[in-house]
């Protein structure tokens, strides 16, 4: 798949890879290498200039705009800047994807509470995001991404603003969800973090081109 922006800047050039079912991989590269662009293409936030992306047997590059919400039911997204609603409680932020789906209040209460409990945030359910630390806000973003039990989670620099201890704990959380059957792509420039988990395959983007890095995923 390729992606060019106005002015001719080539963000991605003939990127070709396969994410196995229930696999967790790292996507590395310097700032501006195309990591965020690739994640946006996978969840149909942007369209490729050329090529196809297949997810669950469907070519999502051909998906109609009206069908994108159905696609995103199966894809959870963790943003680098959290993108929390600052005037809503932690509970309501996590519940948002379920409310968009018109889930029942009983399901919302049960699944949001379970997600917050899993991430150690149940006691923060009534707090506003501004009352939380950066690490806690990041975990709220993760809870929101997984509350719909997606098949795939895309995480864009999820440890970018965290200290090493919190970064490690965040990765442990992703690995727990991965063991539960969720496929995960983590975009990060933190090589130390990647090297601490060599069991996961690593792909690197450089000037829009992707290659698999040897020595990972053994």
Where are these regions (language model features)?
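ABC ATPase NBD coupling module
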Residues: 6, 60-76, 179
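Helix-to-loop junction immediately C-terminal to a conserved catalytic motif
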Residues: 43
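Conserved ABC transporter NBD signature motif
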Residues: 51-59
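Short coil-to-helix segment of the ABC ATPase nucleotide-binding domain corresponding to the Q-loop/switch region
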Residues: 88-95
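Conserved ABC ATPase signature
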Residues: 128-132, 136-138
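A short, proline-enriched helix->beta-strand linker immediately N-terminal to the Walker B motif
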Residues: 147-151
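Catalytic Walker B motif of ABC-type/P-loop ATPase nucleotide-binding domains
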Residues: 153-156
């Amino acid at each position: 798949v390729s992606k060019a922006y106005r002015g001719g800047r080539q963000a991605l050039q003939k990127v070709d890879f396969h994410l196995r079912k229930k696999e967790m991989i790292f996507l590395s590269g310097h700032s501006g290498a195309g990591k965020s662009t690739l994640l946006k293409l996978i969840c149909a936030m942007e369209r490729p200039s050329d090529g196809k992306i297949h997810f669950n047997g469907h070519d999502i590059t051909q998906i109609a705009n009206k069908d994108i919400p159905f696609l995103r039911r199966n894809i959870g997204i963790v943003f680098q800047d959290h993108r929390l609603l600052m005037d809503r409680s932690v509970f309501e932020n996590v519940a948002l994807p379920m409310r968009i789906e018109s889930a029942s209040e009983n399901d919302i209460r049960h699944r949001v509470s379970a997600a917050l409990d899993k991430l150690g945030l149940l006691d923060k359910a009534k707090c506003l995001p501004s009352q939380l630390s950066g690490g806690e806000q990041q975990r709220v973003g993760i809870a929101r991404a997984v509350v719909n039990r997606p098949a795939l989670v895309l995480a864009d620099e999820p440890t970018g603003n965290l200290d090493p201890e919190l970064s490690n704990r965040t990765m442990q959380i992703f690995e727990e969800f991965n063991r539960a059957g969720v496929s995960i792509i983590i975009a990060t420039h933190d090589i130390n973090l990647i090297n601490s988990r060599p069991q996961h395959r690593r792909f690197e983007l450089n000037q829009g081109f992707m290659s698999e890095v040897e020595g990972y995923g053994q």
